[in-house]
Amino acid sequence: MVKLAAKCILAGDPTVGKTALAQLFRSDGAHFQKNYTLTTGVDLVVKTVPVPDTGDSVELFIFDSAGKELFSEMLDKLWESPNVLCLVYDVTNEQSFTNCSKWLEKARSQIPGTTLPGVLVGNKTDLAGRRVVDVAQAQAWALGQGLECFETSVKEMENYEAPFHYLAKQFHHLYREKLEVFQALV
């Protein structure tokens, strides 16, 4: 049984639900943050995720970073060497989706020339009447960027675990590939 540790960057614009998503995931659905508070730096959420059919697990160190541009300079150091990326946007806010390109570019610049497994998460699907970002549009963009696409409603506690389980599985897969290469060299 192997226990791996992965640094996960949680990125996206303010008010898209990054903190609520991380907190709900950490608490296994027991805690939904009803009052909004602006993240002004980085909150760290740690949770161990079992990798199916392996007996192994990945401890995700989720860096929940401020979505405000003015805070982004101080985050550069904290964003160094990420292992996985979770981009979050609000399905009712077109600009938050558009800005995912900026967040992705920033994250990838931290590890040039290296694969960064990632997911694109459309949050607030409970606000279906106000939706402006189409599922197909998000899926097409994610596919073009090499990301897996998910939708969730943190408020309704729907599908909030799936992105993190996917990231843990992808990180474990990369570990197994590197291990096989190393063993072939020995």
UniProtKB/Swiss-Prot annotation:
GTP binds at residues 12-19, 64-68, 123-126. Its main location: other. It comes from the Eukaryota. The keyword Transport applies. One of its GO terms (cellular component) is sperm flagellum. Keywords: Cell projection, Cilium, Cytoplasm, Differentiation, Flagellum, GTP-binding, Nucleotide-binding, Protein transport, Spermatogenesis, Transport. This is Intraflagellar transport protein 27 homolog. It comes from Bos taurus. The gene is IFT27.
